Design a protein with these regions (language model features):
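A beta-rich soluble binding module of mature secreted/lumenal proteins
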Residues: 16-175
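Sec-dependent N-terminal signal peptides
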Residues: 4-13
Length: 175
């Protein structure tokens, strides 16, 4: 019985670490330029962020070489901030924008960065297009609470080309 449960667990978890066929992680990724605070500009709807506005993510280096993750958003329904702490690790080499992230014990999901921009500040990336394990998970993150319309259009175009249902994007309010 334990062996069967282990096999099922491995099968289920491996499915969470995949990525859509059409998505390829960025190469030449530099973690130091990714650390810090990001604002959620757009996303596809999913239960763990439903109803949240002013969503942000903060990434910092862990002592074991991984990444500490703090996601935060305001729930209008509950009139309070909600926060989730997690951890992320590179799936392959650290120069590839492909990480696994966990907010609950040993269960990891894919975090695939498929587009980045440094903008004028070479010290940090300015926006990131991110996919999860399948085409139901998609985010546009930026260093500022708003971005130029051209960035949003690029995100929509690149995401649509990769099979994401961009007509279902949500644009959470940022203050």
């Amino acid at each position: 019985v334990k062996k069967i449960l282990l096999i099922i667990s491995v099968f289920l978890l491996s499915g969470c670490l995949g990525m859509p066929e059409s998505v390829k992680p960025v190469s030449g990724f530099e973690l130091q330029k990714y650390l810090g605070k990001w604002y959620e500009i757009a996303r596809l709807d999913h239960s763990f962020e439903r109803g949240l506005s002013q969503v942000s993510a903060e990434y910092s280096l862990k002592s074991d070489g991984g990444v500490a993750v703090i996601n935060r958003g305001f729930s209008e329904a509950d009139n309070e901030w909600q926060e989730a702490e997690g951890k992320a690790y590179f799936v392959n080499e650290d120069s590839e924008g492909y990480l696994k992230v966990s907010f609950f014990g040993p269960f990891y999901g894919s975090y695939v960065i498929f587009e980045l921009d440094q903008g004028l500040d070479s010290e940090s990336y300015q926006y990131a297009f991110i996919s999860g394990p399948n085409s139901k998970y998609l985010w546009l993150l930026a260093r500022t609470p708003s971005v130029e319309p051209a960035v949003i259009q690029k995100f929509i175009d690149m995401s649509k080309e990769r099979g994401f249902k961009t007509e279902n994007l949500i644009y959470p309010q940022q203050k």
